[in-house]
Amino acid sequence: MQQHNLSTTFVHAGRKKRFSQGSVNPVLQRASSLVFDSIEDKKHATQHRAKGELFYGRRGTLTHFALQDLMCEMEGGAGCYLYPCGAAAVTNSILSFVKTGDHVLMSGAAYEPTQDFCNIVLKKMQIDTTYYDPLIGADIATLIQPNTKVLFLEAPSSITMEIPDIPTIVKAARTVNPNIVIMIDNTWSAGVLFKALEHDIDISIQAGTKYLVGHSDIMIGTAVANARTWDQLREHSYLMGQMVDADSAYTTARGIRTLGVRLKQHQESSIKVAKWLSEQPEVKTVYHPALPSCPGHEFFLRDFSGSSGLFSFELTERLTSKQVSNFMDHFQLFTMAYSWGGFESLILCNQPEEIAHIRPNIKRNLTGSLIRVHIGFEDVDELIADLKAGFERIA
């Protein structure tokens, strides 16, 4: 198969004639029951039900197959499973490879619900979790136990945005245990700014809700796996009843068509805002992977092909409750909301003690309020003016 640049892949992948049936876009095929014309057809579908043959709605329709094909071509995987949200993609990927008595290595700066899953669900299953500092590097080898089955990465880290030395971590882990299953929450890079499977990672997970969809109106999760792990991931996720509706799959594929131009704009605008913030007296540190002030910046330059729109910055002081309200409640363009990856700019505030509470296993010397922003497609100078007005409200 001819290898294309990503901008071409975004447009053309997942549009085989079987999926499009003569139209530009893949068909939107909503179905639970799929009809067999004969006993032989039923036997064939049953035999190949895990290989893209129409069998039953839970296995997928042409709409799902088109998105899975697109994702595999984007990320270089052997297969892609679709989930109703990113959290489902994370939890089912882990559950596919662990059992009672096993051990998981988890980034201590991972997405809070991922840590909650380990602390509540895995603990109930008597599966132990050890949290590691994402900047651990080769010392990850010292944490691997005989029963360690999964090493989970996140790049960059949630909120504090550290970039781990992924090649060093992966090499060290595989030196101790070549069969360990390594997976990564790769949402920030949209699965393409960091090519996980090319770095000997087994499974690349995304909350497709973010950049793949790109419009803050669909929830979906994806897990793209290599050949070694695909069959087990697929069958376990199927047995757990994981699936996504055809409309969400269709809308996600449509969103990916513009992913290239969207990521370029997110990068350009976010770096401009980040550089402006780094010059403001109210700001102590900017945690944008593309800036030298971000821990792991050198690994970002080496391993990533670009930046997206999410980053954070620490203020020089811890805001009082009144200052937080004054700062956060009156933005004209920034919206206060969870999630990110859409066309709109978002903002959230965390206090140092809140970060310490959700990161009990790693220590960061945060003293000022931590502001997380996602830079959307508004005029970047107007976004900067909106932030400047916010600083004036806390002066």
Language-model segments: residues:
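N-terminal glycine-rich, Lys/His-bearing helix-loop that initiates the first secondary-structure elements
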Residues: 1-50
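Conserved PLP-enzyme active-site core in the AAT-like
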Residues: 10-19, 80-279, 287
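Glycine-rich beta-alpha junction loops
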Residues: 15-17, 30-36, 188-190, 210, ...
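Conserved N-terminal alpha-helix of the aminotransferase class I/II PLP-enzyme fold
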Residues: 38-88, 114-120
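Glycine-centered tight turns that cap/initiate beta-strands
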Residues: 76, 147, 282-285, 369
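PLP-dependent enzyme catalytic core of the Aspartate aminotransferase-like
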Residues: 119-120, 128-130, 146-149, 262, ...
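Short, well-ordered beta-strand elements within core beta-sheets of diverse protein domains
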Residues: 252-261, 308-317, 371-376
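Conserved small-domain helix->loop->beta segment predominantly found in fold-type I
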Residues: 271-332, 336-341, 355-362
